[in-house]
């Protein structure tokens, strides 16, 4: 049996390492929010990004000294630059988590619903993951995770 080129590490193992800067796209709700809270409790500095500025600001109130925020929409062309700005604001990045995807039941197969889903889950994914991967490649590595 061949070994996989991918290394899967348990979350608790990641938290025990010296890494301490994470960026989470989609941290204002759901799994992204739970991961952000867990990382904060482990002493991490985090950068969070999402579309709703008010939700980002509300979340930052939990631990203002540990949280940087950036409003961005992964479907917009400027989102890669905004992610770069958040990385810079945080002073670097050791872990990147993309937790922003959408899905709808579309029983009538309305084209705009499907196109919006593709813009978020394909185009947005590509923008964010490419930006994070480029940062890690140029800065000696890191961990990239997608939900």
List the predicted regions and their residue ranges.
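Rossmann-fold scaffold of SDR-type NAD(P)-dependent oxidoreductases
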Residues: 25, 93-101, 146
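Active-site loop of short-chain dehydrogenase/reductase
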Residues: 20, 92-94, 136-147
């Amino acid at each position: 049996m061949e070994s996989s080129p991918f290394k899967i590490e348990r979350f608790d193992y990641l938290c025990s390492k010296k890494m301490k800067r994470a960026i989470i796209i989609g941290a204002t709700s759901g799994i992204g929010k739970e991961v952000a809270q867990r990382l904060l409790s482990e002493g991490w500095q985090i950068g969070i990004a999402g579309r709703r500025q008010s939700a980002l600001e509300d979340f930052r109130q939990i631990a203002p000294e540990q949280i940087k925020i950036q409003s961005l929409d992964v479907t917009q062309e400027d989102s890669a630059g905004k992610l770069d700005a958040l990385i810079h604001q945080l002073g670097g990045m050791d872990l990147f988590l993309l937790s922003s995807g959408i899905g709808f039941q579309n029983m009538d197969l309305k084209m705009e619903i499907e196109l919006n889903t593709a813009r978020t889950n394909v185009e947005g994914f590509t923008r964010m993951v490419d930006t994070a991967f480029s940062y890690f490649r140029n800065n000696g590595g890191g961990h990239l995770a997608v939900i």
